[in-house]
Amino acid sequence: GVTECMAAVEAIRSLCDVPILCTLSVYSDGKCYFDGCAEEAAEVLPGLGADAVGLNCSSGPDQMGTVVRMMKKAAPDTPIAAKPNAGLPTITETGEAVYHMNPEDFARHMHALKADGANLLGGCCGTGPAYIEALRALR
C-alpha cells in the first residue's frame, strides 16, 4: 500500500541518491490492496523523493487506462509507470497461470496507456522479451 511505499522511499532517500520507481498493484478503481489509492501515491510519493510512480501486475493493459489517467490528473508532472500483466490469467487444473494476451495485442493496449499518460512502459506476469519487442516496434 501507499504507507509501505512512503516508508520505503524515505528509507532509500536517507541512505543514498538513486532513482526510485514506486509501483503498486491496485484494484480496477485505483484502490490499493491494503491502504491508500493510486491517486494518493502519485500525489505524495514524489514529495518524499520518488522519481516515478506507477502500476504493476494486478491486471492487463486493457484495464489500467482509467487508473493511469487518474494518476496523471492528480500529479501531472510526475512520470507514471505502467507494467501490467499479459491480461488476466486462467488457472489450469495443475495451478499454472496461463496468460492469453499475445505480444501484439499487449503492445496495442500499451500504446493506449501511453496516450493516457503513462511515460514508462513495461510488463509483468505473462510477458517476456517478445512483448517488449512488440511494444518497441509500435513507437
Regions found by a protein language model. Give the residues of each.
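Domain-level signal for soluble alpha/beta catalytic cores
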Residues: 1-139
